[in-house]
């Protein structure tokens, strides 16, 4: 066979179809664009849906690709079997209203038997039951053995994957056995036994399915083929599974080296090796496409894969973070086809390292708690872990539900998934209730949402801050009204307005509304569900009626400040991408008159030097006095021009593009200044994390930034005065004082420990016998956790057959420590169980091993009650 290596097979396929006048396209991102039906790209044709359905014009009627894909539907089987994987590459050639069955069938045969030189006697073909046309072309345009062609039903030879283009198909299979099927039943049996494996699927796309069994004919017939690169490599390299082909074997061997194990010697070890090998491929490619670990959507898929792989690394005995280095093998073997991997190598490694470290910090604690829960289940002869316990592991220790399930299944146990989801639902309801509002400024929200669809409201405020308009609707409280008078708080809807309604993170305009008979304040401007611009008005004097003509006047000074802040967010977005990398994407914003807030994707806290650089770049753009131009253009034209936008959102065909020279170009419907110089000054107030993988920057501009600088200067002046030093000497003076304080704190700690040690005899002498075990339960004051552990050790070492539980009240909180020697444990003493109940009495929580446990509490006033309970708890434990 001419080609065997995976990378060579990819090139051979793409080159073959280029020779057939196909346009070779790079793989699309794993993140679907403008397709809400998919979480991740899971098929070669998925990114090409708009071409198949006619929504977009393809760059050429013939296209070929090798598309990276991720499927997680079978994730629970990945590793358990050697067949399943989450990441794969799909070779494909596509025709959009050009060639059809007559061309693709002989081409497919030519590639497999001519280019790849596969033996014809090993190839089998299946076609859809009544597809006589396909049968004719196979028998007249190729030299396939007719006895190797089988007709199968819809389940096997009608391709559809959710909603979208679909149709009958023909599949080409490779036989790995000497057995020869005589009919379709025997063929299916051999196929189910993996003795004959599918290599290539040629889909004759004729329909657009809605995923519910309904089909419409497409405007023109299309071709969509898919051949899994890894599966093809299995055939060409004569391997038994995808984990043995060159690219995956390289990863698997590296994991084996790290864990000092070999593949094929132990089934349990093999499962872990396969899981890590597969998952690191998905992880690497997902991060390269700017997917960040999070608790929802595709970010959750990434987090689940990463944490599952990390857990199996620990199972194999790998102690340190390793996935961040294992991705080097993926990048090395795949970067020739996907150069972005090499470009983003350090970024990929960093994201993995941070997430891996974060999980490893909680993995041990979480596993300890889960192991205790498993022990309790087995002791009580129970098989199902409560949903509330599973949810706590997820909420506190970051254990995805699926990971908890997997660990439980290894022990022959299961999770109450319904209970888990109920806990999740309750948490979301609590969050939703905290946000929910039933009215706005005294006006019923439901009433606002049923304003007549016949009323048209037009925004004409980009160039105007004052307009004459006609009042179309009034809403006063819960009801529509014909008029409003002095003292009313109402909603006014007009036919036209210069007031910008809150949208895209920018707050609504305020100002005045008046005519000869009425004067009112516009306190806010929003849009209702129907898209009507609604003004929230406080009636100051006179009467306003439906049909009246009024003057609407925006508070221009306030709007100017909003415009400064909005343009500044664009400059900030651009600066963040330049400093932190192309993975940065807007995740939200808030633009008001006095400040701005910008949320963005990033995997760690922004370093101080990075923040300074970002701030510098924004101020450089401001000081460049660059004109800010706004242009209306087609959406596709805007994309092609390099304009930044959240393209998962829905845009109209015509969009506004706001451009600040070389500094920024974004799709935006908000209001902006006409020159960057008008911003004046930009200062960052804070940077912090608001969710996993999401950071937030708050900043001020113009006079607010000037005030901030002055306030900081005044603060420095006051601090230097208090410290009796110059402003330049403040840090050194504080360092000196901090050092002196630490020395004094150390002296105090030593003294406290000495005082506590003086009580050691009293503590030992307090021991009481409970069922043959010496129980010490004693309360101390102002002893920290470390000193308390030391005292516990002393008591344990001096009192045989003992369980010791000590408490200490420190700054209104309680520290608890318990230790038991081997003899006490052998009799049934269990520090973890004792301390768990004691901590509950003290308003806290904790746990641990039979011989040692720690906890904390918030109710020092209940220490006496808690200590009294120790004897009773031990009495129930000791048989």
From Swiss-Prot:
Keywords, ordered alphabetically: Aminoacyl-tRNA synthetase, ATP-binding, Cytoplasm, Ligase, Metal-binding, Nucleotide-binding, Protein biosynthesis, RNA-binding, tRNA-binding, Zinc
Enzyme Commission designation: 6.1.1.7
Main location: cytoplasm
Catalytic activity: tRNA(Ala) + L-alanine + ATP = L-alanyl-tRNA(Ala) + AMP + diphosphate
Pfam families for the chain: DHHA1, tRNA-synt_2c, tRNA_SAD
Sample GO molecular function, one term: zinc ion binding
Cofactors that this protein relies on: Zn(2+)
Cofactor: binding comment: Binds 1 zinc ion per subunit.
Subcellular location per the Swiss-Prot or TrEMBL entry: Cytoplasm
Positions that bind Zn(2+): 566, 570, 668, 672
SMART domains linked to this entry: tRNA_SAD (SM00863)
GO CC annotation terms, alphabetical: cytosol
GO biological process: alanyl-tRNA aminoacylation
Primary role: Catalyzes the attachment of alanine to tRNA(Ala) in a two-step reaction: alanine is first activated by ATP to form Ala-AMP and then transferred to the acceptor end of tRNA(Ala). Also edits incorrectly charged Ser-tRNA(Ala) and Gly-tRNA(Ala) via its editing domain.
Similarity section: Belongs to the class-II aminoacyl-tRNA synthetase family.
Cited HAMAP family: Ala_tRNA_synth_B (MF_00036_B)
This protein's domain notes: Consists of three domains; the N-terminal catalytic domain, the editing domain and the C-terminal C-Ala domain. The editing domain removes incorrectly charged amino acids, while the C-Ala domain, along with tRNA(Ala), serves as a bridge to cooperatively bring together the editing and aminoacylation centers thus stimulating deacylation of misacylated tRNAs.
Descriptive protein name: Alanine--tRNA ligase
């Amino acid at each position: 066979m001419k080609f065997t290596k995976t990378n060579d097979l990819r090139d051979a396929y793409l080159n073959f179809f280029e020779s057939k006048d196909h346009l070779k396209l790079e793989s699309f991102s794993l993140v679907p664009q403008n397709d809400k039906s998919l979480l991740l790209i899971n098929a070669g044709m998925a990114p090409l849906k708009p071409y198949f359905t006619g929504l977009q014009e393809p760059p050429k009627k013939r296209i070929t690709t090798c598309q990276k894909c991720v499927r997680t539907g079978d994730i629970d089987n990945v590793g358990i079997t050697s067949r399943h994987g989450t990441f794969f590459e799909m070779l494909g050639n596509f025709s959009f209203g050009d060639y059809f069955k007559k061309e693709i069938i002989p081409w497919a045969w030519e590639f497999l038997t001519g280019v790849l030189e596969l033996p014809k006697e090993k190839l089998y073909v299946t076609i859809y039951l009544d597809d006589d046309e396909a049968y004719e072309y196979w028998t007249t345009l190729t030299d396939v053995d007719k006895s190797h062609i089988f007709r199968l039903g819809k389940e096997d030879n009608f391709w559809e994957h959710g909603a979208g283009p679909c149709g009958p198909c023909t599949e080409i299979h490779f036989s790995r056995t000497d057995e020869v099927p005589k009919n379709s039943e025997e063929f299916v049996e051999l196929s189910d036994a993996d003795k004959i494996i599918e290599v290539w699927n040629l889909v004759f796309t004729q329909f657009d399915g809605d995923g519910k069994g309904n089909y419409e004919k497409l405007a023109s017939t299309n071709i969509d083929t898919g051949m899994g690169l890894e599966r093809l490599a299995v055939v060409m390299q004569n391997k038994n599974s995808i984990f043995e082909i060159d690219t995956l074997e390289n990863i698997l061997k590296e994991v084996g080296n790290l864990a000092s194990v070999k593949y094929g010697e132990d089934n349990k070890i093999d499962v872990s090796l396969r899981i890590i090998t597969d998952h690191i491929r998905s992880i690497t490619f997902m991060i390269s496409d700017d997917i960040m670990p999070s608790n929802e959507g595709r970010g959750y898929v990434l987090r689940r894969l990463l944490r599952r792989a990390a857990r199996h690394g620990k199972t194999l005995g790998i102690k340190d973070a390793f996935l961040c280095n294992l991705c080097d093998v993926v990048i090395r073997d795949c970067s020739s086809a996907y150069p972005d991997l090499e470009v983003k190598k350090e970024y990929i490694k960093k994201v993995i390292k941070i997430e891996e470290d974060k999980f490893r910090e909680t993995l041990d604690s979480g596993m300890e708690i889960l192991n205790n829960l498993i022990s309790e289940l087995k002791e009580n002869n129970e098989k199902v872990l409560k949903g509330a316990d599973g949810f706590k592991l997820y909420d506190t220790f970051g254990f995805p539900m699926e990971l908890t399930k997997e660990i439980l299944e290894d022990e022959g146990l299961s999770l109450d998934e319904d209970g888990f989801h109920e806990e999740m639902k309750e948490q979301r309801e609590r969050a939703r209730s905290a946000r929910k509002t039933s009215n706005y400024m005294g006006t019923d929200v439901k009433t606002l949402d049923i304003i007549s669809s016949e009323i048209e409201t037009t925004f004409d405020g980009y160039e105007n801050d004052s307009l004459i308009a006609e009042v179309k609707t009034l809403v006063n409280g819960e009801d529509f009204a014909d008029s409003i008078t002095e003292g009313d708080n109402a909603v006014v809807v007009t036919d036209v307005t210069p007031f910008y309604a809150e949208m895209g993170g920018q707050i609504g305009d305020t100002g005045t509304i008046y005519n000869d008979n009425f004067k009112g304040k516009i306190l806010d401007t929003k849009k209702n569900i129907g898209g009507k611009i609604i003004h929230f008005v406080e009636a100051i004097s006179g009467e306003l009626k439906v049909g009246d003509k009024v003057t609407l006047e925006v508070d221009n000074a306030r709007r100017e400040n909003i415009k400064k802040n909005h343009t500044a967010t664009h400059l900030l977005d651009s600066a963040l991408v330049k400093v932190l990398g192309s993975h940065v994407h807007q995740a939200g914003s808030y633009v008001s008159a006095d400040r701005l807030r910008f949320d963005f994707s990033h995997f760690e806290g922004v370093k101080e030097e990075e923040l300074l650089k970002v701030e510098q770049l924004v101020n450089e753009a401001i000081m460049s006095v660059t004109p800010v131009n706004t242009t209306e253009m087609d959406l596709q034209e805007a994309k092609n021009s390099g304009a930044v936008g959240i393209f998962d959102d829905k845009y109209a065909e015509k969009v506004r593009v706001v451009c600040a020279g070389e500094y920024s170009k974004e799709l935006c419907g908000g209001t902006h200044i006409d020159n960057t110089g008008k911003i004046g000054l930009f200062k960052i107030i804070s940077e912090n994390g608001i969710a996993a993988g999401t950071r937030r920057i708050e900043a001020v501009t113009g006079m607010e930034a000037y005030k901030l600088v002055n306030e900081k200067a005044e603060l420095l002046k006051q601090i230097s005065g208090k410290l009796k030093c110059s402003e330049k000497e403040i840090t050194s003076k504080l360092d000196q004082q901090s050092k002196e304080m630490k020395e004094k704190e150390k002296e105090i700690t030593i003294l406290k420990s000495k005082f506590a040690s003086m009580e050691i005899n009293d503590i030992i002498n307090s021991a009481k016998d409970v069922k043959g075990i010496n129980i010490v339960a004693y309360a101390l004051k102002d002893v920290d956790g470390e000193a308390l552990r030391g005292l516990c050790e002393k008591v344990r070492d001096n009192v045989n057959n003992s369980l010791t539980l000590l408490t200490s009240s420190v700054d209104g909180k309680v520290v608890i420590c318990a230790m038991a020697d081997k003899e006490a444990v052998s009799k049934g003493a269990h520090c973890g169980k004792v301390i768990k109940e004691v901590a509950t009495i003290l308003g806290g929580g904790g746990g641990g091993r039979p011989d040692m446990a720690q906890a904390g509490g918030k109710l020092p006033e209940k220490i006496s009650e808690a200590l009294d309970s120790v004897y009773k708890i031990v009495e129930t434990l000791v048989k």
